[in-house]
């Protein structure tokens, strides 16, 4: 599993919007400047997020984008699924993948299934609201 630039940018945009006034629309130009993403590329990502119902877009004066729900209701997993589709580490576990003829006897399949579950659980446990909390440095023990 490699998360694409599109997926990473979508996360950044959603975090950015979650930190704005929930009643106001944030112009594309402002988001692009803060996130250092080209307006053209960002527009494609925003269109996808509007289509998925994650954000609302309003054209014209006073227009822009805003979240459709509160930050607590968005998980990183849901945002990545909207932009990436499957987050599976191997093709046989992707959404709508044909059943592998070796699935019943594959010695590594349980490993990939567990990894898939760990990724889903971890990304599903983090919401946009979590980015509003102070960051605590992580100590790595040797």
Q: Where are the language model's segments positioned?
A:
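Key DNA-contact positions within bacterial/archaeal DNA-binding proteins
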Residues: 40
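Short, hydrophobic-biased segments on the C-terminal half of alpha helices
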Residues: 46-47
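Beta-hairpin "wing" of winged helix-turn-helix
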Residues: 53-62, 66-67
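Conserved segment of winged-helix/HTH DNA-binding domains
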Residues: 71-96, 108, 114-117
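C-terminal regulatory/oligomerization modules of transcriptional regulators
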Residues: 94-142
